[in-house]
Amino acid sequence: IRKMHKRVLYENYLNFNTENNSVNLIFPIDLFFSDSELSTIKEIKNSLNKFGFKYVLKEKMLSVLAIPSNCDESKIREYFEDFIQSKINNTSLETDFKIEIAKKLCKRNAYKPKRKLSSSEIEALYVSFHKCKNQKFCPSGARIWESLTTELISKIIKP
């Protein structure tokens, strides 16, 4: 279920329309970062704005004003730490970085393994999943599901 949810979130993030999917915070969240981290955040501002993150850079501080609608407000610092790390690690092309942001967000926001889902949540996930372009792999490359062939069944049941 988690891998399916990651795939759904990932494809939603890649097709994100910030005008409709950004939620303004009632109270801005202030996060303190080092000068080098703030410099990196400044570099990626346009990319993050496209995902629905709205923020103002101040001296030694980042003031977050809006976040994507399906992001958890309590994880904002973790999101920005992930984005900084991704930017530092390698991604220089805009499209590659957009993919990295989408992967980080879906990983943080996917259903947790021990969470019990209601039947309506499972049904909604199933419908959303079948609208995805890629239904075999989650964004990390792990297989979501596998079709059972007679060959595979015989390997599993082999005495």
Regions found by a protein language model. Give the residues of each.
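Long, charged low-complexity intrinsically disordered regions
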Residues: 1-159
